[in-house]
Amino acid sequence: MPERARFVTHTGETVTAFALGRLEAVYYPGAVTRGADNVDYKFINGFVDVGELPCRTAVRAEIADRTVALKDDFEIVSTNLPGFNRRLEFSGFWHRPTRLSRWVRTRFVPPEGGDYSFRLATCGGVHVFVDGNKIAAFEPYTRNEAQETEIVLPLAADGSDLVMLVEEIAERDTNYFVELTWLGEGPLAAEVPGNADGKTLEMLMALARAIRPARIVFGEGEDLRLVVDQPATAAVTIEAKVHQSVHMRHLPPLFEAASTLAVGEKEAVFALPGELPDGYHELDIAFSLGESRINRTIAFALLRDDGPHRLAGDLAARKREGLSWLAEHGELRAGRVLARLALGLDLDDGDRAALEDTLDAIDTRRDCSDFVIVPLLWIYADHREALPPSLRKRIEAAILGYRYWMDEPGNDTMWFWSENHVLCFHVAELIAGGLFAEDVFANSGMSGREHAALAEKRLARWFDAVEDHGLAEWNSAAYYPIDFIGLLALQRFAGETLKTRAETVLDRLFSMIALHTINGVSAGSMGRAYDKELRAGPLSELAPFATIAFGTGWLNRGVAALPMFCAGDYVPPEGLDQFVAPPEGRAVSAHYVQGYGRAAQLALYKTAGVQLSASIDATPGAKGHQQHLVDVQAAGHPMARVWINHPGADDPWGSDRPSYWAGNGVMPRVTQHQNCCLFLSDLGENPRLAFTHAYAPLSVFDDHIAGEDFLVLRSAESFVALKATGPIEAVGEGPGAGIEHRVRGKRSGWAILVGALGGRSLAELAALAEGTNLSLSDDPLNLSCEGPLTPALRLDYRDGLFVEGRHAPFPTTSQTPEIAWLTAFAVPASN
């Protein structure tokens, strides 16, 4: 008999060793109802309490009087072991209301027989069975907000079988997990049942914990190489799948392959097909040996271009080149069809597939279908004569049958509440109403003329908010392209008043893009960020906008809005090029405010070689979301990016909001003085993760020197210097190897400096960084920085920045960037 895998949990730790049944997912919409219009147009970064949707109401009715029987014979398809997460986590994104359920099991062996307490946390529902008997049920079903209770389990001295049914109702992004904390005294052993060998499972889990891409980015002709820390002790099969982008996840994977990690080897190799597009790709991995199987999801960047594109000609010529690129390489979505029709090309099979998928998204009201109905309306308005009559009729039916706002009948989980979705829904309603003014819209019972009039009023409120407060999703590489969907469509189809207002906001967006783009990479502090935009700036959907607008950058397959920019006649303001590429020896400095309640006070320092930006003050000590507060991008390599945050989740590859790298679990106090940013973190008494960390991928910088409390990096002739209030621990194994640098403690501080080496060596800079004094003081909490690289700076946790002892409040309340030109900072001569 194989040795059963046994994992020990100590008091206060969570149990994560479980055998997993299949994830069951069933469409579950609930009754059609009219929602209440509760949008107040005060957009914030974070989850909005939107009330209860029909699917959740239906779940509550279902569970009220049901009886859940033990299912003791479910098929075990995978294993979850300690290492990724303190939760048993199945979170994800479902575009339609979906009932989720999964059976899991383990065997508990306590210190001795008796009744033992556990803390049980979840968002959905959990039913707990011990030795065949139902012991507990906990069903809060609170959307994405964990609830907890204490349960008592009777455990036999020689072990008890524990089975749980874990359930949730998915409404787009869904926190679906169980966190089971051992409160008893002494060690609790969890034995994973099944025929899987214990030692084999432990080996597979060690591989799954450690596996990561061998490179920050893979280029032309390179294989995908995945590395681990310890060699395999037996030949392990590794299956890998590259998924479509998040909005196309319902389609088959882009790539599937298997490789073998041979005995004694630490690298698995996958040949990447030429048709796999460039992108930051999610990669599902399955490790298997005999009957043992472990699953893991990671990601990797693929960028075959060895440098940014340099587009010749004026804006019109660059737009034409952009349309040609997208017509050939664009993702199979409505935007690609628009690009091809704008060029006068006939529909091909890919276009028809894209339109079929677009219509399905609209008809079934998938979340984010508002992002594709707008380009579909553009296609219909400008190119309907190029469409076959049958397809034209289907498009007309989809437009007339759509749900354009939450107060119309529906039982979907479309997200109506964030800044970008509000805009897209209102724009879609305006254009659809104008195109079909005399028709009755089947879902609402209103005429197109009534819809258009209502949309005008709603859009006026949206513009009032954005004009008064700026953007909650400032500078976001993920969400500016979505804003462009709505704004560019308004610029093309709206009446004069809304067109003018749209152009004003477009001008602001392109001004901010110009400020925050360096060598073709869109970077900078962001109101909402995900790992994919942070780790792979040139692969974001925002990057090509800068390429077309300013002539240098990266083109990729993103078609959410770029075809609308290229097919339309909007022209960004003149004079922005000077901010895109400052002259040698000069630096551009900018300060401005964005977001409701001055949520973001933004500072920028940028030279031709390096860019530093930060969001000042924010809400220190509060729970974070997706705010990306401190950012550095060097011009020497498109992936030469550095930032600091407090991780918001356990798993370095997880997708929580905030995640391990995107956003902050606990918000810091941040300030910036010219080329120096200070980051002061107070995590409170019982932080889930008691450290802050820097993302700094050493391999994409030309050189680096690390000291006990500093790290300096060179990119071409520019530098990035990090200094910390405690030892900087370079992570050498697992997903953080070569990129992650931690400072432990509930309170910590960092200084980030950028500039030109000015002919000095990196060693000279390292000596100056070592001689810089960065210190924390309590009562009141503050961070002081003094040394040869900066004036005397102090960041008070309550009162903000002091320069040479004088209080330096943020200098403006304007949404329009206040810009100054400075002499670029260069490393001074060492004494």
Model-derived segments and spans:
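Accessory carbohydrate-binding/adhesion or oligomerization-edge regions at the termini
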Residues: 1-83, 165-207
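Surface-exposed loop/turn motifs at beta-strand-loop junctions within extracellular Ig-like
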Residues: 124, 166-168, 287-291
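Beta-strand-rich ligand-recognition modules
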Residues: 130-177
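Short beta-strands within extracellular/lumenal beta-sheet-rich domains
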Residues: 96-108
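Extracellular polysaccharide-recognition and catalytic grooves
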Residues: 370-381, 388-594, 598-600
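Aromatic-lined ligand-binding clefts that engage carbohydrates, nucleic acids, or primary amines
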Residues: 110, 114-128, 162
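Surface-exposed loops/turns
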Residues: 112-113, 156-158, 278
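Ser/Thr/Asn(+Pro)-rich, low-complexity disordered segments
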Residues: 202-420, 454-458, 552-831
